[in-house]
Amino acid sequence: MSKKTVVVGLSGGVDSSVAALLLKQQGWNVIGLFMKNWEDDDTEEYCSSRQDLIDVMSVADKIGIDVEVVNFAAEYRERVFAEFLSEYQAGRTPNPDILCNSEIKFKAFLDHAMQLGAEKIATGHYAGVREFDGKFQLLKAEDGTKDQSYFLYRLNQAQLSKTLFPLADIYKRDVRKIAEAEGLHVAAKKDSTGICFIGERPFKDFLSRYLPPKKGEIRRLDDGKVMGEHDGLMFHTMGQRKGLHIGGIKEKGHPGGGDHDAWFVAGKDMEKNVLYVVQGHDHPALLKGDLVAEQLSWVSGNEPHTHWVYTAKPRYRTSDQPCEVERVDAESCEIRFAEPQWALTPGQSVVLYESRVCLGGGVIR
């Protein structure tokens, strides 16, 4: 009986390397696929794709699998990067990794894998998938500190039905141990962080290449007093503290703030090009008990129940927050939290959970 084929997305990191290794050990015919999604900056010091490809080839040779290199740069620019720029231009703070997953890694990559005759695709994401009651569920990973289901909430039934997540039940520390035991040189390789196409370069420098910055006033939200000058609204996001250059100003008697309390971004007026700030982490303007989300995507294809207790992540690095869905239709949904949330950020995604099951979510308005 011939082996079933799985195409594994290899990034050059330890997670995808171990995912490929485990599938090989489980008896799959494994093909590695290295995706090249960005190509303008390959000569620059910040781009790591060359070294990543070298690492992929080394790992593939060690575990005995073939690797194909595929260029999805055109698809990436059209489906992910154009949206990224559009969102920043509109004053929001997008999360391109979410779009990259649904449009590139689990669409362009999936289509290519199927053309190669594969039954499944696999990645090194920390998440799980299971079939339950005739539907495929997206699950949180066993390692809660590394769980990446937040970034995968836009995956649909067709995508999940073809997907394997070999690291679903494995802790990161054990992934590194497996790599070390098998002699994979990427065992101690540092995790990649930040937005993939920006790499380690300064964000402001990168964005300025594509969107011309426009200076404007920084005003205090409470009374409109001018506090300074910003170098472009797109460089600032809700709750931001660093980079405002107004930290030394003493102001008394404003909600949430004392004499020396830090200043935080509390809003933007795109038409007037004004950045609004407040003093103090606990200023009421930074706390909100509800939100409206748009561009909804539900994993099962079914909307969540209204007035049912769920949990939600209004940003990636936050603990699950108890909430209810007040209203939901095809266009938007309203989510009310049990406790006010700090610095809810337009453009970021809010993702809904029922226990370990990721239900889906949308983009905060």
UniProtKB/Swiss-Prot annotation:
Keywords: ATP-binding, Cytoplasm, Disulfide bond, Nucleotide-binding, RNA-binding, Transferase, tRNA processing, tRNA-binding. The keyword Signal does not apply. ATP binds at G9, L10, S11, G12, G13, V14, D15, S16, M35, G124. It comes from the Bacteria. Residues 146-148, 315-316 are annotated as: Interaction with tRNA. Transmembrane segments: none annotated. It catalyses: S-sulfanyl-L-cysteinyl-[protein] + uridine(34) in tRNA + AH2 + ATP = 2-thiouridine(34) in tRNA + L-cysteinyl-[protein] + A + AMP + diphosphate + H(+). GO terms for cellular component: cytoplasm. Pfam families: tRNA_Me_trans, tRNA_Me_trans_C, tRNA_Me_trans_M. Disulfide bonds join C100-C196. The record marks H125, Q348 as: Interaction with tRNA. Residues 95-97 are annotated as: Interaction with target base in tRNA. InterPro entries: MnmA-like, MnmA-like_C, MnmA-like_central, MnmA-like_central_sf, Rossmann-like_a/b/a_fold. The active site is at C100, C196. GO terms for molecular function: ATP binding; tRNA binding; tRNA-uridine 2-sulfurtransferase activity. It is found in: Cytoplasm. Its main location: cytoplasm. GO terms for biological process: tRNA wobble position uridine thiolation. Its EC number is 2.8.1.13. Belongs to the MnmA/TRMU family. Catalyzes the 2-thiolation of uridine at the wobble position (U34) of tRNA, leading to the formation of s(2)U34. NCBIfam families: PRK00143.1, trmU. This is tRNA-specific 2-thiouridylase MnmA. It comes from Dechloromonas aromatica (strain RCB). The gene is mnmA.
